[in-house]
């Protein structure tokens, strides 16, 4: 006990961690808050599960058009608990989207987007777009028939945009047609660009909530 107390005192002297703890644990919670105000937190938990299970799958997944499908099959059939890791990843992805939708409805119906919380709402909308992008890019990674044709259709949508449409299609596909470059780009987006982007906007979102507090009743 003496040693643990000494360690605590050492950190307290340098970082004043007690003040941080008091700020976190003593934040005022309005009496109107109910279980529906937990939907955003549940979405965060789903993202953390996604991050953990996705990280685990990167040890076995091979982002090539010739090995992607076989590596996923290997994960599902030969790796210990691989089927469970991938299944949890898929289930938590669906749960994350559902919780996000419900969270958006709750915020909108209770007026949580109004002044002075406009920027909090904007960061939330950006995170919703990133979440959809997660779904689109992740759907293609097994590179089966469903994934391939989903990528071909989705990456071809920007072609309808005047002037820059063809450029955006080529940018997404990494060339004129869907192939290895497309899979590499979608894999990079799904495992690096989107997670870090979402983490940054989550941090901004939470800091604004901490600063402004929970919105009042409608």
Swiss-Prot record:
Database matches in InterPro entries: Cyt_b/b6_N, Cyt_B6_PetB, Cytb/b6-like_sf, Cytochrome_b_N_euk/bac, Di-haem_cyt_TM
Transmembrane segments: 35-55, 93-113, 119-139, 189-209
Membrane topology type: Multi-pass membrane protein
Gene Ontology, cellular component aspect: plasma membrane-derived thylakoid membrane
Transit peptide in keyword set: no
PROSITE patterns hit by this protein: CYTB_NTER (PS51002)
Binding residue positions for heme b 1: 103, 205
GO molecular-function term, one example from the UniProt record: metal ion binding
Cofactor binding description: Binds 2 heme b groups non-covalently with two histidine residues as axial ligands.
Residues reported to bind heme c: 38
Keywords linked to the UniProt accession: Electron transport, Heme, Iron, Membrane, Metal-binding, Photosynthesis, Thylakoid, Transmembrane, Transmembrane helix, Transport
Co-factor(s): heme b; heme c
Family recorded in the similarity comment: Belongs to the cytochrome b family. PetB subfamily.
HAMAP family: Cytb6_f_cytb6
Function field: Component of the cytochrome b6-f complex, which mediates electron transfer between photosystem II (PSII) and photosystem I (PSI), cyclic electron flow around PSI, and state transitions.
Known partners and oligomeric status: The 4 large subunits of the cytochrome b6-f complex are cytochrome b6, subunit IV (17 kDa polypeptide, PetD), cytochrome f and the Rieske protein, while the 4 small subunits are PetG, PetL, PetM and PetN. The complex functions as a dimer.
Record-linked PANTHER family: CYTOCHROME B
Protein name per Swiss-Prot or TrEMBL: Cytochrome b6
Natural source organism: Prochlorococcus marinus (strain MIT 9215)
């Amino acid at each position: 006990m003496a040693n643990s107390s000494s360690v605590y005192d050492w950190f307290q002297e340098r970082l004043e961690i007690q003040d941080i703890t008091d700020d976190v644990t003593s934040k005022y919670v309005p009496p109107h808050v109910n279980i529906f105000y937990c939907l955003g937190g549940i979405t965060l938990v789903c993202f953390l599960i996604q991050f953990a299970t996705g990280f685990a799958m990167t040890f076995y997944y091979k982002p090539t058009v010739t090995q992607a499908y076989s590596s996923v099959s290997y994960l599902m059939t030969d790796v210990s608990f691989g089927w469970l890791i991938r299944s949890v990843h898929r289930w938590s992805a669906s749960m994350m989207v559902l919780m996000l939708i419900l969270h958006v409805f709750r915020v909108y119906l209770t007026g949580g987007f109004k002044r002075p919380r406009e920027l909090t709402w904007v960061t939330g909308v950006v995170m919703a777009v990133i979440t959809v992008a997660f779904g689109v890019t992740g759907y293609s990674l097994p590179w089966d028939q469903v994934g391939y044709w989903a990528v071909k259709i989705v990456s071809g949508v920007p072609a309808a945009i005047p002037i820059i449409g063809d450029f955006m299609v080529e940018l997404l596909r990494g060339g004129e047609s869907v192939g290895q470059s497309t899979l590499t780009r979608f894999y990079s987006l799904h495992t690096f660009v989107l997670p870090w982007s979402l983490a940054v906007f989550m941090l901004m979102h939470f800091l604004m909530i901490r600063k402004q507090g929970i919105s009042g009743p409608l």
